[in-house]
């Protein structure tokens, strides 16, 4: 199948639309880096656009705009459609979490008169990429009286940053240089440097005590309070244009916040009530297998769909309505895929691999080796998506996750398919996925928005 770079066929108005949309996205991904922050942003914007908490509604009718929140980390937005709900819904599901470092429950330690935060990495990171990189600390801490304290340090102009110190090349020959990439630094040594000045005291660990004193003075947080906290360490800094032509975006967390942003904007921008109920579901925990009560494996989707249908059907409601509605639904698993990286192109089947700037990739399946753990979209669904994109003049390309037996991975698709929902993976291509600086195309970003909006409209 012949590939052509679509950018050269755009007129100036189309190029400006892409560039303006990209600036909004860059502001979003620079500011909101954790699942709690993304969820709060989405809720705030939705409320301003007229979305109402579904728990406060007793009845639902076509055109109603509602949301369901799951423990401040996942959220679903829905616009009730004109068609009977049992005829199916259109889901777009993306995830709010990204690979990062999480503070341990008792994280503050002192070594050689330096204070550190001990961490446990979250998701599939290359550990060595996080060494000597400016980091910010974000999250929530619940004090012993139950008060919630929010933390966001490292991205404001006058904030300090934090760092995991690497070994200098003059002394790394035995300890690091000849090791495999996943052994360059042990997970236990991913410790964040946070302090170096001591306090005047006869007690041991003078630097740790000084750091804890500063934390208590500013945030009222005591050492024991970290037990009831969610502290996430993420790269500091803002999204940047990449290249002289500024056609690419470099930023942390584009997996999967590029799909979060585009799926949100597409449902928020719907001008008319859709035929089928449109649902934008932002979920947590995808990077560690969609586990936990805020992940897609928690059955929260089944809960809010059941509640929604009950408020539509009222006395006519029965469980079969829920099963029919799910079985007749379609879903886009809105997650990024691996673009060809010319420096490591040997891992790709280039005929079936996406390129930056060629439109939104359609990924029929993911998985490992013999499609293990994959959700393999049926040809009928792929045909539907293909016709939809072509009809709306949206640029698209095919995608697979590398050569057979080269590696592999998965998305939320298999969990959606577990409900009987016909599901396909469709999200922008990324270079340097799971790194502190992921790279995407502005053209692909905008075409993802157009594709998701067209899907909701049908």
Swiss-Prot record:
One of its GO terms (cellular component) is cytosol. CDD domains: M18_API. GO terms for biological process: proteolysis. It comes from the Bacteria. Keywords: Aminopeptidase, Hydrolase, Metal-binding, Metalloprotease, Protease, Zinc. Zn(2+) binds at residues 95, 170, 434. Its cofactor is Zn(2+). Its EC number is 3.4.11.-. It is an enzyme of class 3 (hydrolase). One of its GO terms (molecular function) is aminopeptidase activity. Transmembrane segments: none annotated. Pfam families: Peptidase_M18. Belongs to the peptidase M18 family. PANTHER family: ASPARTYL AMINOPEPTIDASE (PTHR28570), M18 FAMILY AMINOPEPTIDASE 1-RELATED (PTHR28570:SF2). This is Probable M18 family aminopeptidase 1. It comes from Borreliella burgdorferi (strain ATCC 35210 / DSM 4680 / CIP 102532 / B31) (Borrelia burgdorferi).
